[in-house]
Design a protein with these regions (language model features):
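Hydrophobic alpha-helical segments
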Residues: 1-130
Length: 130
């Protein structure tokens, strides 16, 4: 949602992540970290220095590349395997990311809920609403 500016998707699904056990600090990191799609040293270093777990960092890199470049570098794919994901889990992650990318493109293109001109809710706002 963040990479595709899908305000509706963020505002609807970020609270579900919090309810599912994602910590507010982790959600904030995902919202504010620069994209690592191009594997730039600065961006990757920012991710490495974040409070996210190793698995979360690998998922962020994979998601960034899938969302913005479509093709995923072998090294980024290997990070998921290093973090212990099975082939099945990688396929499930891939289809989940692809599904959200499809939905976000429809939501933004059609301005569903007339959200394009709005800001994404802050993590603090989301937590307060729970």
């Amino acid at each position: 949602a963040v990479l595709t500016d899908a305000v509706y998707e963020w505002n609807a699904h970020a609270p579900l992540a919090l309810k599912g056990g994602i910590q507010p600090s982790e959600l904030q990191e995902v919202r504010t970290l620069p994209s690592t799609a191009d594997s730039g040293a600065e961006e990757v270093q920012a991710l490495k220095g974040s409070a996210l777990t190793g698995l979360q960092k690998a998922v962020v890199r994979y998601t960034d590349q899938m969302t913005l470049k479509v093709r995923v570098e072998d090294g980024v794919f290997a990070l998921l395997k290093q973090e212990g994901l099975s082939d099945r889990e990688v396929v499930e992650l891939t289809t989940g990311v692809a599904g959200y990318n499809c939905v976000s493109r429809v939501l933004v293109a059609l301005d569903v809920g007339e959200n394009n001109a709005r800001e994404m809710k802050s993590v603090d706002e989301l937590v307060a609403a729970l």
